[in-house]
Amino acid sequence: MRRQIFTEEHDAFRDMVRAFIAKEITPYHEQWERDGIVSRDVWLAAGRAGLLGIHLDEKYGGGGQPDYRFYVVLNEELARAGATGPMFQLHNDMIGPYLDRLCSPGQRERWFPGYCSGELISAIAMTEPGAGSDLQGIRATAVRKKGGGEVGGDRYVLNGQKTFISNGQLADIVIVVARTDPDAGHRGISLLMVERDMPGFTRGRNLDKLGMHAQDTSELFFTDVEVPAANLLGEEGGGFVALMQNLPRERVTIGVTALAIAEQAFADTLAYSKQRSAFGQPVGKFQHNRFTLAEMATEIAVAREFTDRAITEHCAGQLSNDEAAMVKWWDTELCNRVTDRCVQLHGGYGYMREYAVGRAWTDSRVQSIFGGTTEIMKEIIGRGLGL
């Protein structure tokens, strides 16, 4: 079935993204996987190509294009190429909306140009060793101080530890979720922008993950970091609400990526099943394998229609948190099932990282964990049903 949600402009953009990936990412990705981190050069190249901050004002170097579908195209093509190293998805879809919604004019002047050019790589620090899905369990603290101090004015003294932070080694600016009022529950959570060279901000090791080896993921430590009050994003105490407002987009974006991974793994496996022979015939001709491929094709087609509808609803500002949770749950779990079946259909070759399906299997497993686990998605959906 032909997709109905894109225009010729989106199609042209897709061609450009594919060319960018072929030139700037694919030739280097294996080395990045060995290094455990990408080169900053790819971020600068993405900035020059107009792939960062597509929705932000052109005067800051953005694309001036608020259409979310351009990000859908970018994320789909990165997923299909197995380009897990450059975390443009995080930069554009998870951090960009916070900046666009919360930054003051002065903050825009300070951060937006570098954000769009790739000179300022961004991260967001929510998860702590003792607080994952339960954001109200955040223990990092930011205590407001008046005058004096190293920054010479009103500031927050930030203390705490974060973990599993994507872009953690490379990040120049980090949105830190911290508790500014210990007695106010979720109304005591605020967002602070921590910059690379602030004293007391240190990074732990680059974590050794099961997959996504080219993506730097780190622990971050904050010890009496003096963050200027001018680096508060939005209002003090407004952090939790801001986080909740962006979750539907984050979850649809993860679903978009997961479904694209599943589609590519299926396409690779279908081609392999037609050319790989056993017992005198292509392995896809065996009834069990044929049925397995038929099931995957159907499940992916159904998910594609559902996800494209959610993209359309999001673009119209009509996608609910419950519906976004459905997309995230369904697409990520489908991706897990599809990549696992595809590895099985490849036999021993599927277990080799030199085969794309093997990398997809390990790289994509986290999709049903980050951004809210499958179990949390079901909780959200259940509550939406009045249960």
Residue positions per predicted region:
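A short core secondary-structure module
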Residues: 154-155, 159-203
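Flexible, small-/acidic-enriched active-site or ligand-binding loops
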Residues: 137, 197-228
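A short, Trp-centered hydrophobic/proline-enriched beta-strand micro-motif
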Residues: 118-126
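Helix-loop "lid/cap" segments that line or gate small-molecule binding pockets
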Residues: 94-102
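A structural signal for short hydrophobic beta-strand segments in well-ordered beta-sheet cores
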Residues: 140-143, 149
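Short Gly/Pro-enriched turn/cap motifs at secondary-structure boundaries
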Residues: 88, 115, 130-133, 164-167, ...
